[in-house]
Regions:
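Aromatic- and Gly/Pro-enriched helix-to-coil junctions and flexible linker segments
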Residues: 1-45, 51-198
Length: 198
């Protein structure tokens, strides 16, 4: 039994599910149980996964329609046992915004954009700063006058131009996520969701 207090459950678009999931050696979940938003904010959610075989991890994560892991918010090792295993995952921010922060900005961007005392182009993509630095902020480099992130519109967001068009800025960023289409899709879906989540 996996128990947690989850914030941001209902921020995910329909192409994703927030789940308690069991994984073997593949990024595709072997077992999943959908987590629904609690009736009251701050109310614990409990999920029971049963009948699991050939599993080595249990997670609270977002998966796509193919049950492929997109963002992990909590993970614990799992070994098969006869008794019920009780796990308290604590309080977790499982919002799509935090998913983008953890899965994209923290892993692929902050090395140049704020992990030290310096941020390239003065753009800090670190936790607590990224959304304010991006959402609704005019780009100083867009010839078309685009916003860095235009709420609800990935096509009008200069961030997506930078990540998909080599000529968008002086330093080519295309190779950063070109081999990670799930992350590009997550960014697009986050931008589309902003209008409804603000």
């Amino acid at each position: 039994q996996l128990t947690a207090i989850l914030r941001g459950v209902d921020t995910w678009p329909d192409d994703y599910e927030l789940v308690a999931a069991a994984f073997g050696d593949s990024p595709y979940a072997t077992y999943t149980k959908v987590i629904h938003a609690p009736e009251r904010e701050g109310e614990p959610v409990s999920v029971i996964l049963s009948g699991m075989r050939e599993v080595n991890q249990v997670e609270i994560c977002a998966v796509n329609r193919l049950r492929k892991r997109i963002v992990t918010f909590y993970q614990t090792d799992f070994t098969l046992q006869e008794d019920t295993l009780f796990v308290d995952a604590g309080t977790l921010d499982v919002s799509i915004s935090n998913g983008v922060q953890q899965q994209v900005f923290n892993t692929d961007c902050i090395g140049c954009h704020g992990a030290s005392t310096f941020a390239a182009a003065n753009l800090f993509l670190t936790e607590g700063k990224s959304e304010a630095a991006l959402v609704g902020v005019p780009s100083t480099r867009s010839e078309a006058g685009k916003l860095l992130v235009a709420p609800g519109s990935p096509d009008e967001s200069f961030l997506m131009d930078v990540l998909t068009h080599p000529e968008a800025v002086r330093h080519d960023h295309v190779d950063i996520l070109s081999a990670k289409p799930d992350k590009l899709t997550l960014l697009e879906d986050w931008i589309e969701s902003i209008k409804t989540n603000l």
